[in-house]
Amino acid sequence: YCMRYANYLLGSNAKLVTAQANHIDGFEVEMYGSATMVNEEGIVAQLAFGMDNDYKCDIEVWGSKGTITSGRILTAPAGFTPTYTIKKNQDFETREFPADDAFLKSILRFVNCIEDSQTRIEEYATLHDQECLVERFKELARIN
């Protein structure tokens, strides 16, 4: 989901340019890795994932005017109120996102895909983009 979210932020013209996957003996999957994506405007996303690491689901957007960070995205439980911090030079401001229920939203999205053909077509396109990114990751990381 790291690449899917980065693709959403960078836009559909983003390309995967580096990928590294690492395994641990005794497991049949890649346990951790990293990737770099870039869009046509030269905006870069650096991604890392790991199933053998301390749990994190962070995002940091770093630009010339400041930085936005959030320590809990995409997997927050129902009712959890995530925060984000805006940093400009050495000034920090922490704000809250409204509590949400990501699991319920995913079920509602699934139902909407079943009931609405336009939503379904849009979701197919998003899934195809994600499939292409995963295949490119495997190619760059030399995963069979």
Report each predicted region and the residues it spans.
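Aromatic-acidic/polar surface patches that form glycan- and anion
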Residues: 28, 99-103, 120-127
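C-terminal helix-rich "cap/oligomerization" subdomain common to oxidoreductases
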Residues: 40, 109-144
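Short polybasic amphipathic segments
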Residues: 59, 77-89
